[in-house]
């Protein structure tokens, strides 16, 4: 499960641990966050391996899969949760470096890790990709981020058809606004108090409100779902 060191990923990791799942969590460089997630997960009796590295690099993705197989002997579920976003008011302000990094983390990393995992997935396995409500409504200040999240929807649907006859499910989650460490660090301070106000509920959500969706899509309860995008956005977009 990528990006399980904090935010939505940590909430999902804890939910999986409560269901008895062991986890491998690749993360970038938030070492203390990753250690805290590991501590919480292991409190529930699950095993947790944390691996620091850059998912946009193929060799690290290969190492993640190798370590998972070495430790647990199999892969049942892949959760592509990691991502980055940066606010820019104008497309002219998006540097080549920002655009490239956003693409590499959000798309290339997902592709590389999925490609490495698929040969080891058995019938009944599940792949869960994180897209975003912004794919379905647009966001004028997150142009490169929204581009990647739209690509993830296409990737999910195409891969779902590709793997269906192997009985490997591929679905996506499209969250609305959730209060995670990513959000205040991304937006200008004056906008932070209004975040989440576009939802029908008039508020942002907490990560624990999304965690059960990750568990559902990993479980046999979703055995007839593939290629789906599950919207958990408080009514911000109704599809």
Residue ranges of model-derived segments:
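Substrate-binding pocket helix/loop in short-chain dehydrogenase/reductase
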Residues: 89-91, 95-100, 195
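Active-site helix of classical SDR
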Residues: 114, 148, 156
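Alpha-helical segment proximal to the catalytic Tyr-Lys
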Residues: 119, 161-165, 223
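Residue(s) in the substrate-gating loop at a strand-loop-helix junction
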Residues: 132
């Amino acid at each position: 499960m990528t990006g399980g060191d904090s935010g939505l990923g940590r909430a999902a990791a804890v939910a999986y641990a409560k269901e008895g799942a062991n986890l491998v969590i690749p993360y970038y460089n938030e070492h203390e966050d990753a250690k805290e997630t590991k501590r919480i997960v292991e409190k529930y009796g699950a095993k947790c391996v944390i691996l620091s590295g850059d998912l946009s690099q193929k060799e690290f993705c290969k190492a993640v899969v190798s370590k998972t197989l070495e430790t647990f002997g199999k892969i049942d579920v892949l959760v592509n949760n990691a991502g980055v976003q940066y606010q820019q008011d104008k497309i002219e302000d998006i540097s080549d470096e920002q655009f490239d990094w956003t693409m590499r983390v959000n798309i290339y990393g997902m592709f590389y890790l999925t490609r490495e995992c698929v040969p080891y997935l058995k019938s009944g396995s599940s792949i869960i990709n994180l897209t975003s409500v912004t794919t379905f409504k647009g966001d004028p200040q997150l142009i490169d981020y929204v581009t990647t999240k739209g690509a993830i929807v296409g990737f999910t649907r195409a891969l779902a058809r590709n793997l269906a006859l192997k009985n490997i499910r591929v679905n996506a989650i499209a969250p609305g606004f959730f209060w995670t460490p990513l959000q205040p660090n991304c937006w200008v301070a004056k906008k932070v108090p209004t975040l989440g106000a576009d939802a029908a509920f008039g508020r942002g959500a907490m990560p624990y409100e999304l965690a059960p969706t990750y568990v559902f899509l990993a479980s046999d309860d979703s055995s007839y779902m593939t290629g789906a995008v599950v919207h958990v956005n408080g009514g911000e977009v109704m599809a």
